[in-house]
C-alpha cells in the first residue's frame, strides 16, 4: 500500500430520506433500494474507528441530511474530534433555529443545492420547494455566521443542463450578492430519456482531452487573456473549445479534463451509506439505471465492508479494498465512453479487459463530467 494511500475525506449519509422530489435527481433511477436513517450506533462506529488521517467529515449522500433528527449532534461529534465538517443540503429545512444549532455545533462549511436562479424554473426542477424560501434561509445563515469569531464558508452545488445552462452567467452575481464562497458545477446524470436529452457532454466524452500529451498531428493553440465579455472573444473561445482538432492552452495552462481518473480514490475518499455499508465512491453507493445514447446501463452498488461487522479502519486497510484502489489509480479498465457501448457496458458485470464489477471505465465521474463537492 502506498504511503499516501490514506483516508482523508469521509462522506457520511445520515439518511436516504428526502423532503423533495427533484426531476433530475439520481434517486429517480434507484432499483430496489431501502430508505432509512443512520442509527446512532452506526454513526458512533464510524467516528470511533475512522483512521486518524481523516481531515474532513462531509454529511451528504443521496438524502437530505437535515431530515435526520440527530444531525446537529452528528456535526458536533465530528467537530469535537478535530475534523473539518461540511454539509450539503437543499436548504428548505434550514430555518433560523437549525442554522444556530449547526453553527454552534461547529459546522465549517454549508453547501446548498441550487439548480436554477429563476423562481419558475427552480420550482419546475425542485418540486415541493421555492427559491424564495431558500434565499431567506441564506440571508439568515449569513447574518448568523457573520457574528462568529471563526470562518464558516458557504458553497453552492449547481447541476447544469441544457434547460438551465444560460443561468451560469448569473452565478457570479448571485454568489456575490449572497456571499457564496465557492460554486461546484456538475453535469446532470442521465437517469431517464428526458434527462439524457438534457446532457451537455454528448461529444466531449469521445475526446482524448485527458491524455497526458496531444497527438503528434494535433496542434497546440496558446491563448492570451482577453476581454471575455466581448462578444467576439466569446465566439472565438466557444469555437476553439468546441473542436477536438487541437489542444487549447490559456495563459500557459492546458484546458483539459481529467478523464480515466477517479477523484474519490486519488484524493482519499470513502462513503458510509446510512445502513453502515462502506463504498469507495458515490457511483457505487446505489443500484440504479443510467441512460446514454439510447442505451441503458445497470450500475450496481459495491461495498468493501459493513460497520456492523468491522471498524472503518479495518475496512479501509483490508487487502481487497487496497487492491481496488491500486487498480483504480492505474485505471486498468476499458475506455467504455470512447467505444460503441457494448453489452458489457450495458450490464456492468465485466468489461472488455476482463475486469469483474465494479468496472470503472463506464463511470461518468471518472470521465470528468460529474463532480461532487
Show which residues each predicted segment covers.
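Flexible mid-to-C-terminal extensions adjoining Fe-S/redox cofactors in radical SAM and related proteins
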Residues: 1-6, 28, 277-278, 282-373
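Residue-level signal for mature regions of secreted extracellular proteins and peptides
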Residues: 11, 15-18, 255, 274, ...
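Conserved alpha-helical substructure of the radical SAM core
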Residues: 1-109, 120, 124-128, 132, ...
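Short, flexible loop/turn elements at secondary-structure junctions
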Residues: 63, 91, 158-160, 340-343
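A broadly structural signal marking compact, well-ordered functional cores
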Residues: 55, 91, 247, 251-255, ...
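A structure-centric signal for secondary-structure junctions around beta-strands
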Residues: 6-7, 19, 151-153, 266-267, ...
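Radical SAM enzyme [4Fe-4S]-AdoMet core and its adjacent flexible, acidic
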Residues: 13, 33-38, 81-84, 104-279, ...
Amino acid at each position: 500500500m502506498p504511503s499516501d494511500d490514506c483516508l482523508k475525506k469521509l462522506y457520511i449519509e445520515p439518511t436516504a430520506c428526502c423532503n423533495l422530489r427533484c426531476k433530475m435527481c439520481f434517486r429517480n433511477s434507484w432499483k430496489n433500494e431501502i430508505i432509512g436513517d443512520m442509527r446512532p450506533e452506526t454513526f458512533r462506529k464510524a467516528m470511533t474507528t475512522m483512521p486518524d488521517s481523516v481531515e474532513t467529515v462531509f454529511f451528504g449522500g443521496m438524502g437530505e441530511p437535515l431530515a435526520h433528527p440527530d444531525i446537529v449532534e452528528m456535526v458536533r461529534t465530528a467537530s469535537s474530534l478535530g475534523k473539518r465538517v461540511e454539509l450539503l443540503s437543499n436548504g428548505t429545512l434550514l430555518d433560523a433555529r437549525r442554522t444556530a444549532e449547526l453553527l454552534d455545533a461547529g459546522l465549517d462549511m454549508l453547501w446548498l443545492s441550487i439548480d436554477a436562479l429563476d423562481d419558475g424554473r427552480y420550482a419546475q426542477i425542485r418540486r415541493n420547494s421555492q427559491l424564495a424560501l431558500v434565499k431567506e434561509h441564506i440571508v439568515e445563515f449569513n447574518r448568523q455566521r457573520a457574528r462568529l469569531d471563526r470562518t464558516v464558508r458557504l458553497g453552492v452545488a449547481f447541476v447544469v443542463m441544457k434547460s438551465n445552462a444560460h443561468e451560469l452567467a448569473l452565478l457570479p452575481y448571485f454568489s456575490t450578492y449572497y456571499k457564496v464562497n465557492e460554486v461546484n458545477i456538475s453535469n446532470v446524470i442521465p437517469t431517464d430519456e428526458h434527462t439524457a436529452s438534457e446532457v451537455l457532454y454528448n461529444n466531449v466524452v469521445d475526446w482524448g482531452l485527458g491524455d497526458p500529451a496531444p497527438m503528434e498531428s494535433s496542434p497546440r493553440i496558446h491563448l492570451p487573456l482577453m476581454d471575455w465579455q466581448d462578444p467576439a472573444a466569446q465566439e472565438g473561445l466557444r469555437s476553439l473549445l468546441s473542436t477536438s482538432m487541437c489542444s487549447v492552452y490559456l495563459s500557459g495552462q492546458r484546458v483539459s479534463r481529467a478523464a480515466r481518473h477517479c477523484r474519490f480514490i486519488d484524493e482519499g475518499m470513502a462513503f458510509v451509506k446510512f445502513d453502515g455499508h462502506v463504498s469507495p465512491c458515490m457511483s457505487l453507493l446505489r443500484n440504479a439505471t443510467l441512460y446514454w445514447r439510447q442505451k441503458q446501463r445497470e450500475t450496481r452498488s459495491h461495498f468493501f465492508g459493513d460497520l456492523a461487522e468491522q471498524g472503518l479502519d479495518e475496512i479501509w486497510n483490508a487487502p481487497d479494498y487496497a487492491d481496488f484502489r491500486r487498480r483504480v489509480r492505474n485505471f486498468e479498465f476499458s475506455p467504455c465512453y470512447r467505444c460503441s457501448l457494448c453489452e458489457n457496458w450495458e450490464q456492468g458485470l465485466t468489461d472488455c479487459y476482463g475486469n469483474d464489477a465494479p468496472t470503472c471505465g463506464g463511470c461518468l465521474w471518472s470521465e470528468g463530467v460529474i463532480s461532487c463537492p
